[in-house]
């Protein structure tokens, strides 16, 4: 009753939901039988068979993109984005609505060059794809610093993230809109 009254739903997120596709499908099917809206959030770094299996039973896929440039992606995430982009390209051919989520991280992916590369990539991948629902830009925060400190560990991103500056989220948003790409800049923070 709560979900019908609130208009809410359930989002499966991570870790990485695509690492447990059979369980995720069962949960999603049960929720949908109850009339509850479902979404999955994924980084897309999973076998296509898992992405396809889970995505086809969800009402919405929230797909994380961090960087367009593969070399930078490997540097900052430890993995190539080739699989992620191939999965996204295939996902956009399914009938499931897809929203791209981009954490805007100062000094990592908010330069004019990287913003333009990301938006060009998105334009090319999503052209003519009716499943594409737009972009959610998520400003980065450093809340994790405190958690690492409590554990007596160094925060791995402390040497990477540009300190003392706001991200260029508003610039990213304006460039996306100028290119005709539906985008929002979240007031919620990620990190």
Regions found by a protein language model. Name each.
Residues 66, 94-98, 114, 154-162, ...:
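A broadly tuned preference for mixed-charge, low-complexity surface segments
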Residues 1-143, 149-150:
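Conserved AdoMet/S-adenosylmethionine-binding subsite of the radical SAM
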Residues 165-191:
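A C-terminal junction/extension of Radical SAM enzymes
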Residues 120-123, 133, 148-175:
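A structural motif corresponding to the C-terminal lobe/cap of the Radical SAM core domain
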């Amino acid at each position: 009753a709560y979900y019908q009254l609130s208009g809410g739903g359930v989002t499966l997120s991570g870790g990485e939901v695509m690492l447990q596709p059979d369980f995720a499908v069962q949960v999603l099917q049960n929720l949908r039988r109850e009339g509850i809206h479902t979404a999955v959030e994924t980084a897309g770094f999973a076998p296509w068979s898992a992405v396809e299996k889970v995505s086809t039973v969800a009402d919405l896929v929230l797909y994380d993109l961090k960087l367009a440039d593969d070399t930078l992606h490997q540097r900052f995430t430890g993995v190539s984005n080739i699989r992620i982009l191939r999965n996204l390209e295939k996902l956009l051919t399914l009938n499931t609505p897809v929203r791209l989520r981009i954490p805007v991280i100062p000094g990592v992916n908010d330069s004019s060059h990287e913003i333009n590369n990301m938006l060009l990539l998105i334009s090319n991948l999503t052209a003519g794809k009716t499943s594409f629902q737009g972009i959610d830009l998520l400003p980065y925060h450093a809340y994790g610093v405190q958690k690492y400190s409590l554990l007596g560990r160094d925060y791995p991103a402390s040497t990477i993230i540009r300190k003392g500056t706001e991200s260029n989220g508003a610039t990213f948003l304006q460039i996306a809109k100028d290119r005709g790409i539906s985008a929002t800049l979240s007031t919620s923070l990620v990190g």
